[in-house]
Amino acid sequence: MTKKIFTLFAFLLLFSCSDSEPIAPSETVDYTAKNEQEIKEYLTKNNITTAQRTDSGLYYTISEQGTGTNPTVSSNVTVAYKGYLTNGQVFDQSTTAGVAFPLSNLIKGWQEGIPFFKPGGKGVLFIPAHLGYGGRPQGPIPAGSVIIFEIHLISVN
């Protein structure tokens, strides 16, 4: 019995002497200004002069208009896409046949940007972190990253 009490006491003493501090909740970082600058620099470096900016900070270009009705946030859409960072690192890509999604289940950048396209339309979305994955990393996408998507809206289902 004494041996068990001594072992328990030694165990408690060992862990009570730890010098590690409790982990604080992660701070919220505002990437808005940094992302705005990063997008502008990317557009300039790549000689993209037709990009439009929305009030939220999303930039987009439309290279092919497409025809038909624009989707809404409540639409199901089939989209072929390629997603990459401003350094060119591709993090996701669909087949040319595209992938069907309920637009309401996607990141805010897609919810806002895809409705600019008509079926058959093509273009690019330049999405700041607050409309993408925010301050948390998502697989190969670092926290606070601008993400770029080449978009081909195949259909509105």
Locate each region found by the language model.
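Cross-family detector of peptidyl-prolyl cis-trans isomerase
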Residues: 2-9, 17-157
